[in-house]
Amino acid sequence: MSLLGTINPNLNPARAVGAQGDAEGAAPVSGGEPMPIFEGNDSARTSDTALDKLGKDESKYDEQIAEAEVTRLAQQLTRQSTRFSVSQNAENPFLETKEDSTLNPLGPNFKAKNWMKNLLALTSRDPERHPRREAGVSFRNLSVHGYGSPTDYQKDVFNMVLQVGALFRAVTGTGKQKIQILRDFDGLVKSGEMLVVLGRPGSGCSTFLKTLAGEMNGIYMDDKSDLNYQGIPAKQMRRQFRGEAIYNAETDVHFPQLSVGDTLKFAALTRCPRNRFPGVSREQYATHMRDVVMAMLGLTHTINTRVGNDFVRGVSGGERKRVSIAEATLSGSPLQCWDNSTRGLDSANALEFCKTLNLMTKYAGATVAVAIYQASQSAYDVFDKVTVLYEGRQIYFGRTDEAKEFFTTMGFECPERQTTADFLTSLTSPSERIVKKGYEGKVPRTPDEFAAAWKNSEAYAKLIREIEEYNREFPLGGESVQKFVESRRAMQAKNQRVGSPYTVSIYEQVRLCMIRGFQRLKGDSSLTMSQLIGNFIMALIIGSVFYNLQHDTSSFYSRGALLFFAVLLNAFSSALEILTLYAQRPIVEKQARYAMYHPFAEAIASMLCDMPYKITNAIIFNITLYFMTNLRREPGPFFVFLLFTFVTTMTMSMLFRTIAASSRTLSQALVPAAILILGLVIYTGFTIPTRNMLGWSRWMNYLDPIAYGFESLMVNEFHNTKWKCSSAELIPNYEGASLANKICSTVGAVAGSEYVYGDDYLEQSFQYYESHKWRNLGIMFAFMVFFLATYLTATEYISEAKSKGEVLLFRRGHYSRGAADVETHNEVSATEKTNESSDGAGAAIQRQEAIFHWQDVCYDIKIKGEPRRILDHVDGWVKPGTCTALMGVSGAGKTTLLDVLATRVTMGVVTGEMLVDGRLRDQSFQRKTGYVQQQDLHLHTTTVREALRFSAILRQPAHVSRQEKLDYVEEVIKLLGMEAYADAVVGVPGEGLNVEQRKRLTIGVELAAKPQLLLFLDEPTSGLDSQTSWSILDLIDTLTKHGQAILCTIHQPSAMLFQRFDRLLFLAKGGKTVYFGEIGERSSTLASYFERNGAPKLPVEANPAEWMLEVIGAAPGSHSDIDWPAVWRESPEREAVRNHLAELKSTLSQKSVDSSHSDESSFKEFAAPFSVQLYECLVRVFSQYWRTPVYIYSKAVLCILTSLYIGFSFFHAENSRQGLQNQMFSIFMLMTIFGNLVQQIMPNFVTQRALYEARERPSKAYSWKAFMTANILVELPWNALMSVIIFVCWYYPIGLYRNAEPTDSVHERGALMWLLILSFLLFTSTFAHMMIAGIELAETGGNLANLLFSLCLIFCGVLATPETLPGFWIFMYRVSPFTYLVSGMLATGVGRTTAVCEKVEFLHLTPPANTTCYDYMSDYIGSFGGYLENDNATDSCSFCQISSTDTFLSAVSSYYEDRWRNFGIMWAFIVFNIAAAVFIYWLARVPKGSRSKN
């Protein structure tokens, strides 16, 4: 569907102009109605699409006349004189600015046909400048395969260990199983033709379209396959002409922050040709093309609206689909493949989409292939050709008007009112195809037999002749290839290489991506501003913690800690870029497939677009920090500080981007990122100075970019400076003692001097030298360039992981025989089973006796302060053994009525009577009814049988024994025909149950609850293909036969589906009733009502559901002057309904209540007692964890690697001053796994909560207290296991156990250390639950938790001791849980043992004359501790400031005797977290209506 083709190479003027003729009519569509896209009502500009503008009120299309007209005009156009006369009358639409021109897409009189006619005439003036570019396609013996396994086992914590061999086989490629997806396809789609691809989900439609478009990611063509793109070989098409054949996937991925106008203008600019019309700039061209496409697709009114997505508000889903269509249109591809692009659209909009495609092919000569799962007859008739797929076999390819006859001649029967598309697809389902009498043994049955019948037919032979003729006309590598290359070259920028698939130059690609990048930033400026403000606040907090540091030696440690913090915060400010890159990756890959730009061009642009933010952030953060803390206040050092912090930011940004681009999934990126960050922090040079790094690990420091930045910042602060020793640090501090006999206690001090030189301090403490400062800058630049190169390379060549094809997963040991055949050859037996078992199961299905009826139901809510009525006096009833359809236009209130009747609304005012057997509903009503939601919400780790059992145990009455409930579940499984996959895992779409199996399970979960009153179903067939919809209706039929009362909403069913309902409740806009009553045989009762009241007669072939919408004026393009809700209110039918309701109320209320089980529990809100609720929830959540080995193993791997990394980095730390500091930092660094553990816990909780709140809470399965308690308790055993892992991997390598040996308390202190680690992990998990309890998104909860975690770390007493904290912040030191945790672990780990100085830590001072060192220092040692290395020396004393580790502990306000108290305080924090989590959930998430009840 190439609109760009109209001016570029893609034209066939003869076909295009001829197809429209001279009349101002609709573009003709074979067999269909005039397209609603031409010449519309000017007053309805925003709602009419341009398809409305090309011709209303036109006569029906006569195909023969049109073909004659095409021939006549084609002959005219071959004559040059005629061509020039057409051309000379043409105007240039790009330069047309008149408001009322029919060529102005923004004007009220725009006509797409006139615009196209002018454009075609213009391009025909100069065919060399605008050469034709067409790409029809022929294929012979097309076979495609992939690798994988048809069935797999679900992984859990135990059997994951058994996967090591499988992993090895996967890596070596020896374990691959070849799976044939497509077998021997043949076909021909010429330029200007449309092909519809029909088949059930899983039949190979998507693979076929991807193959045609050259998207061979994970799939492979067999060697014998021949593809001919009008002379171009498949490899050349994929490589050199990638954007000329495109695949439009079912999903709509766009940048949500961009407006629709900006999104489409970008697409137009990236494919803007070099050879434009004279005087038309690139900007004019792109803007005009965008406006034309938006006008044609009815998007003009959304030009400034954000595209949005599931989380960002923007245009509607239908409009977003049209944005995808417009983007593909603007790509200008002559061959387009559309995969189920009508999903989610009603039949009217689907038809409009098909007609749009038809218009494009007829005018622009594009080649289009479309897969549609539900096609109305009108939509089907738009296409030229059809191919039918059956489990990877092609069973037909040919003209759409010949397909039905091909199969009816073979012996199959098409039921009355079944559309041709449904008939063709039904042939691939053994349970649905109907064989004519006398043909039972003659017709094909299996896919292979169907394929053989097709191959042996005359239609196939004719197709092969056409393909051979086409291939002779366009031989591979023939003249047409050169013409195509020349036409591409006419489009490409001058400096773009000939073999490139891209249109604009690399410079232009980067420029356009940059413009778009700034538009995205503008569209989401709040995020950027919040990040800047957040970093500024963090700078203020840290600046206040280290506020106005003294310029003396007492600030040495604080300055080091401050610079360490500063360089880390700058370095890791880009860590979130990993998430950002993953969010945009599908969009970039899609647009690269459209050949809009190189992925690396977007990568360069995104870096450049981030620069203003990074520079602004660096200035704001670093200036605030620098001047608040009194760092070196000289111009030179200040700018050097800014330079190095910014270069660190940029270098680490490149590193994080490389990680993101090099991995195929987010989880692959996050685990190495977590370990990498830990390593970068430890080996920066502050936590372990370089002189203390172990020889085998020193290389990590060399590979740490942050280490070079930290060294330069330290040198920048201390080089060439002189620091006065504070009076408290002069040793000994005797009054009257001479300075010559004193020394400053700081490393680098010289005896007899009250000053310490910064260079001496750096050299002796860290082995840092001034000569390294600028060398380090060069090294950092080298790192930056290296990571930049790897990032750009990875971006260009590594694509995102693609999902596997549909496979069933089973629990190990529960594999069902024949399960692999569930979707293949066992269909017949599965159908027979359903029919056989239904009678047996009927005895178990509870036959409902109660009648649910309602009268005058109204529902009012306030929207923006204005009252609005959603439902308006709705009456009706549902009786046992009947199925009532609830229909209406979009927005009529169908789902709202279901929610109101099912007591599921939590806001607004509901009035009217809703009665069960004439009595008001009690609080057990919700659990006594089943409600099948439109979305199939299930826990992905559970099996089908477990999901049903969970529902039965918790929702069936308490007096029913557990065994009876389990037996009933087996009956439900038989009834639903789910035996073959009863032990299959639900999984996620694509890896687990398919769409139909999910829908059956959704219904089964409600049936398992044994609903005593009725079953509500909301859109059970929405988004399903026709065959799956039919099987769901089969199921509903079975249920009604067994006495179930069913009320079911349905959206525009086919005629055959509609006939299967007993009654209809039909709503108009505003929730007003249009009809309630019997449907009747062949819809006669319904049709009679409407016809009597002024509706046109129902045509024999019409779909009553669509006819009904047209009658009331609710279908697109229809209008009604009759007020149908008013007609209903005055009708005798409504009077009869009211009388019957009054009769039901009076007679049923006299019925005696069944007292056999009407004890108190029958009327309780929940069927099961709290203990049963909690037990079942615990079992399910624990099994979810057990069956999510990725979660458990990633948690374990994180704990093991982090603990070992820290343990061996600080291996056997000595009890020297630096060694004790290292041991303190080993505890401090262990705290950093907090953030990663929180990020792992929150998504699991959100998954459980989403299921509970959407399905299980409204159905009263269990209470919110059981839900919260189970989710908190399930973490306990895993945290206990992780605490053992951390204890072993961390405690012993560091050697903390050795400090307990002198006091003979190894066991007691080891046990306490393990308990403290356990309390840390429990605090982490309960804190995560507290943070996420009231918050919707795991990302938001994670960010908030990390912010609070950072504050806890800053104020825990390690980086800034309580003595150095400003008075204002002391409260934070006291409320930080890590204060007590670190203090308890430090005291337990190093207390009550001797300390020994390293050689460099001894202070060398001179005693007074004739005095021994011992005599001189004994008083000081008695007061402050320490020891002398040489007691009797008289010339130079070597003094160590600490002799006991308790001296070190007291310096950081940690005391050995407080260790058990600190453990108790940690438990107080844990209890607080649990209480707060429960309270926050109750406050934020429990609906007001149920707060008093739950």
From Swiss-Prot:
Entries under Gene3D superfamilies matching the protein: P-loop containing nucleotide triphosphate hydrolases (3.40.50.300)
GO CC terms, sorted: plasma membrane
Keyword set includes Ubl conjugation: no
Annotated TM spans: 527-547, 561-581, 636-656, 669-689, 778-798, 1191-1211, 1227-1247, 1276-1296, 1312-1332, 1351-1371, 1463-1483
Membrane topology of the entry: Multi-pass membrane protein
GO molecular function terms noted in the UniProt entry: ABC-type transporter activity; ATP binding; ATP hydrolysis activity
Gene source species: Aspergillus oryzae (strain ATCC 42149 / RIB 40) (Yellow koji mold)
InterPro entries: AAA+_ATPase, ABC2_TM, ABC_trans_N, ABC_transporter-like_ATP-bd, ABC_transporter-like_CS, ABCG_dom, ABCG_PDR_1, ABCG_PDR_2
Keyword Repeat: yes
Family: Belongs to the ABC transporter superfamily. ABCG family. PDR (TC 3.A.1.205) subfamily.
The protein's name: ABC multidrug transporter atrG
Function: Pleiotropic ABC efflux transporter involved in the basal level of azole susceptibility. Confers resistance to miconazole and clotrimazole.
Span of domain ABC transporter: 162-416, 852-1095
Record's catalysed reaction(s): (R)-miconazole(in) + ATP + H2O = (R)-miconazole(out) + ADP + phosphate + H(+)
Binding-site residues for ATP, renumbered to this chain: G888, V889, S890, G891, A892, G893, K894, T895
Annotated disulfide bonds: none
Localization annotation: Cell membrane
Glycan-carrying positions: N41, N141, N340, N622, N835, N1410, N1432
